[in-house]
Regions:
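A mid-to-C-terminal "edge-of-domain" accessory segment
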Residues: 1-39, 294-473, 505-510
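Generic long, charged, amphipathic alpha-helical segments
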Residues: 490-519
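N-terminal capping/small domains of soluble enzymes
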Residues: 1-107, 369, 374-377, 381, ...
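Catalytic alpha/beta core domains of metabolic enzymes, predominantly
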Residues: 214-350
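Alpha/beta enzyme core
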Residues: 4-9, 33, 46-68, 84-90, ...
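Short, small-residue-enriched loops and turns at beta-alpha junctions
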Residues: 40, 44-45, 74-78, 132-134, ...
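Short beta-alpha connecting loops at secondary-structure transitions
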Residues: 135, 210-212, 240, 268-276, ...
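Mixed-charge, glycine-accented linear interaction segment located at domain edges/termini
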Residues: 521-562
Length: 565
């Protein structure tokens, strides 16, 4: 980088549009969409798609709902030519879909292009030429008048060829390539030359496509350019005003949104922003931005993972894990505060109300995503995320104080491993902490069974204590109090919760007991799970008794160590 970039790079001059209207407008309907994945996207690949992959992507674009699809550059590629012929000859184009083909402004290429789409019921022929000063001066050595003559001649030639094939409904699309770097008056003159030569009118619309061939200014400047053209193009009622934003400055989506506010009727782009250099505008992001504002995009991304898989298989370009809406991590929260907010948001969300879950701009379920990956746990996570995973995946709803206790257990694990742990890992850690007997581990007290007397006030426990099988009896005003009495420990039960986990034949009772033990600071939790609620309650009491006794023993060991020191 140089010390003074202004000596090398000139800022783009703002557009003189003092009465601009677009900033106060909102987008209330979806634009017409044109997918250029099979042309602009394909020509930007390390290895362009073969016929099989092109067909796979074409079918996916149709399934998504695109009504206009640019299928290739048939005059530049035999593969593209053959692909277009296959679509037409095998009648693979749905009745509500129109294909588009592209050609440069040369007679031989135009003729080859028209030949490629011969017999199609509908076809858009996309004719373009560069108009910006640098291209006129450096590349072509042409004056403005010569450029206008080139446009008039080649649009006229295309009209001559297509008029001879009345069985096809022909539409002209004209693009002043490098529009965003061209003087507005020159762009307007170029477009009017094409419009007038073609003869736009009722039943004979012309698509005027205005590209940011290379994005060279902020998105608001592009919007000013579009609004200026929108005001000056005639006959506007017979013109479809289209935009083709690129992403060289990283603002392709913003440029497209501003352009729609400024008067654009149609947007060209690619799935996931594929395309030359930094790519075309990403239609997935643009469409779902509309969706999250309550405007249906008329494209179906209800299985976003399937769309991503097809795109990746056809282009060999992976979707970035942070890609808006589609990436593997975009609905994932590792941060403890984020997880807590999401958990509370899900709990408060009205299924029939407006979506208001913090940190999630869209319901992942609308895109076919599960909630499994929304909360993921690493050393930065907190109790909210851990509680969310246990509740969603296992039906375990922990009291708030228990969330604090168990999150410390998980934190120690993630700090030690320095890795993320998933829902299965958390469940295993939960079982290891609170349900150790079910994992085959040995505790000071192990439960084997119980018998209640007829009144429910007395209990006989079948236990192993320090490995010795024995039977203990106790009395109380219920199974929990009777179990505490039978154990003979100075333990006080502070709270008890029960709920069902699972459903049908898999349903089990989950009991959670909070208790305190004399000589141990604070309280602790125990858990029991069984098809029988009384059994689950007894197991929970024994679980917390074991955990509190471990803490008591650890405290005693620490005291001895201090005395010896």
């Amino acid at each position: 980088m140089i010390a003074n970039p202004s000596a090398k790079y000139a800022p783009f001059a703002p557009i003189a549009l003092a009465d601009r209207q677009w900033p106060s407008r909102t987008i209330t309907q979806a634009p017409l969409w044109l997918s250029t994945d099979l042309r602009d996207g394909n020509q930007a690949l390390f290895e362009p798609m073969n016929a099989e992959r092109k067909m796979s992507l074409f079918k996916e674009l149709v399934r998504i709902g695109f009504k206009q699809i640019e299928v290739g550059f048939p005059a530049a590629s035999q593969t593209d030519f053959d692909f277009v012929r296959k679509l037409i000859e095998e009648k693979l184009i749905p009745d509500d879909v129109t294909i588009m083909v592209m050609t440069q402004s040369r007679e031989d290429l135009i003729a080859r292009t028209v030949l490629a789409v011969k017999g199609a019921p509908r076809a858009i022929v996309h004719l373009y030429n560069a108009t910006a000063p640098a291209w006129r001066r450096i590349v072509f050595g042409m004056s403005v008048q010569q450029v206008m003559g080139l446009i008039s001649h080649h649009v006229g030639y295309l009209k001559q060829l297509t008029d001879a094939q009345p069985d096809t409904r022909w539409t002209l699309q004209y693009s002043p390539e490098t529009f965003s770097a061209t003087e507005l008056e020159v762009s307007l003159q170029a477009c009017h030359t094409a419009i007038n030569t073609w003869g736009a009118g009722p039943g004979r619309e012309v698509i005027i496509n205005l590209p940011t061939t290379v994005e060279n200014a902020t998105a608001n400047v592009f919007a000013d350019q579009i609004e200026w053209m929108h005001r000056h193009l005639v006959p506007r009622e017979h013109i479809v005003l289209s935009v083709h934003p690129h992403n060289d400055r990283g603002t392709g989506v913003a440029a497209a949104e501003f352009a729609m506010m400024a008067g654009a009727d149609r947007v060209e782009g690619c799935l996931f922003g594929n395309g030359e250099r930094c790519g075309n505008v990403d239609i997935v992001t643009l469409a779902l931005n509309l969706y999250t504002q309550g405007v249906h995009p008329q494209l179906d991304f209800s299985d976003i993972n399937a769309v991503a898989r097809v795109a990746e298989e056809c282009t060999s370009i992976p979707v970035h894990p942070r890609h808006p809406y589609a990436g593997d991590l975009v609905f994932t929260a590792f941060s403890g505060s984020h997880q807590d907010a999401i958990k509370k948001g899900f709990a408060a969300q009205d299924p029939n109300g407006l979506w208001e879950v913090p940190y999630l701009p869209i319901d992942p379920a609308d895109l076919g995503r599960t909630y499994d990956s929304v909360i993921r746990v690493n050393s930065q996570s907190g109790k909210g995320g851990i509680a969310f995973l246990l509740e969603r995946e296992r039906g375990v709803v922990m009291p708030r104080r228990m969330q604090v206790e168990f999150s410390a257990v998980v934190q120690r694990q993630t700090d030690a491993s320095e890795t993320e742990i998933n829902g299965e890992d958390i469940w295993a850690l939960f079982r290891q902490t609170y349900l150790r007997g079910s994992n085959g581990a040995s505790d000071a007290i192990e439960y084997h069974g119980h018998t209640l007397d007829g009144s429910g006030q007395g209990i006989e426990l079948d236990l192993s204590i320090q490995g010795v099988r024995q039977r203990l009896c106790g009395q109380g005003n219920g199974p929990i109090a009777a179990t505490v009495d039978a154990l003979g420990l100075p333990m006080r039960v502070d709270s008890y919760e029960e709920r069902a986990t699972g459903s049908g034949a898999d349903a089990q009772a989950l009991a959670i007991v909070e208790a305190a033990l004399e000589g141990v600071a604070g309280s602790g939790f125990g858990v029991g799970m069984s098809h029988n609620i009384v059994t689950a309650s007894i197991q929970a009491v024994i679980s917390v008794a074991n955990r509190l006794q471990e803490r008591l023993a650890a405290r005693a060991a620490d005291t001895r160590s201090e005395v010896q020191a």
